[in-house]
């Protein structure tokens, strides 16, 4: 394989630029030409395919976002869109593609593979909801951003003896909420993977203030409900505290990636090129126990809950490459 391309698709994630850089630099070291596909699958179909060299990626490892830009392109789910994209790839002499994105992006890579075109998937999403990898590119940065914001909110919450419901991203996965909540000593962590009762949360808030607590911090995954709706339900369940709600929003997607995300993205990008060099396609790169692994992209792209909860309060991870997490005390004070 002498000529490959790289694209980013779906929601952006810190570390995508580091992955692109690694793909380009590794490809050059392997004697391969590398092209950038701008604007994801939409750009592929439109022929926005341009050569990249070491200078193109010389100053991007520390930048958030993706310099190749990203776009959602549902038309690629249709055969017509796929064939147009492949036509453009062949026109530019591209023999393989590295796709950086979430499960929607993986579906596109899977379609390319089904048409006999080698594609490698890299997990680029802050949600950490990709099967077959312990961590996704961007997750660590998003958790760190959420942690910093929650720490600041705790300061003002303590000053006014307030309860804060803080909504974080994650789509249908509770990973950001879980990690950021534990890291900040949140009083309650509400995630889609675990059931909860409003009356229990109200009782916990009341007990905390009666014991002299100066604040109550509730970290809420967006996949459960909005912070505004959750706050309203708390009041309906009898909460009488001075309540505020905050949605952290897209700040979690931006910013310079952490060292962990930069290293993870670099390792994954280089590994993807080595696979293509060996003629391997149709797989997604992941990290398990700090080692690079490959999984069939067909299974990796399938959506579904990554967690289920046992009666004992233990998370059973449907993704076998994620560690089990004890949740028996998560709906109690972690302060």
Curated annotation (Swiss-Prot):
EC number, as in UniProt: 2.7.1.11
UniProt-annotated binding residues for ATP: 11, 72-73, 102-105
Binding positions (Mg(2+)): 103
GO CC terms of this entry: 6-phosphofructokinase complex
Binding site for substrate: 125-127, 162, 169-171, 222, 244, 250-253
GO biological process: canonical glycolysis; fructose 1,6-bisphosphate metabolic process; fructose 6-phosphate metabolic process
InterPro entries linked to this entry: ATP_PFK, ATP_PFK_prok-type, PFKA_ATP_prok, Phosphofructokinase_CS, Phosphofructokinase_dom, PKF_sf
Subcellular location: Cytoplasm
Keyword Magnesium part of the UniProt annotation: yes
Regulation of activity: Allosterically activated by ADP and other diphosphonucleosides, and allosterically inhibited by phosphoenolpyruvate.
Catalytic activity: beta-D-fructose 6-phosphate + ATP = beta-D-fructose 1,6-bisphosphate + ADP + H(+)
Membrane-spanning intervals of the chain: none
Assembly, per entry: Homotetramer.
Family that this chain belongs to: Belongs to the phosphofructokinase type A (PFKA) family. ATP-dependent PFK group I subfamily. Prokaryotic clade 'B1' sub-subfamily.
HAMAP family in alphabetical order: Phosphofructokinase_I_B1
Name of this chain's protein: ATP-dependent 6-phosphofructokinase
Gene name of this polypeptide: pfkA
